[in-house]
């Protein structure tokens, strides 16, 4: 019984450890999507740029030049 509990605890710790890695993969895909649209990721968009999306979780905005 002790071995089973230990094994279950190890499995839970492994799965909880891999969760942040999935979030960083999502962030990379958001950044790639922004760059493919010709934008850039930044905290604020400049006055001559508009927000076209998000680069979550690293940056809150994907900005693009209006020109």
Swiss-Prot record:
**Presence of keyword NADP:** no
Say which domain of life the source belongs to. Answer: Eukaryota
Keyword annotations for this protein, in alphabetical order, are: Antibiotic, Antimicrobial, Defensin, Disulfide bond, Secreted, Signal
Q: Which cysteines are joined by disulfide bonds?
A: 34-62, 41-55, 45-63
What InterPro entries would the database entry show?
Defensin_beta-like
Q: Where is the signal peptide?
A: 1-24
Q: Does the keyword Secreted apply?
A: yes
| Gene Ontology terms: cellular component | extracellular region
Q: In which tissues is it expressed?
A: Weakly expressed in adult and neonatal brain.
| Family affiliation | Belongs to the beta-defensin family.
What does this protein's UniProt record list under function? Has antibacterial activity.
Query: What is the protein name stated in its UniProt record?
Result: Beta-defensin 9
Q: Which organism is it from?
A: Mus musculus (Mouse)
Quick one: which gene encodes this?
Defb9
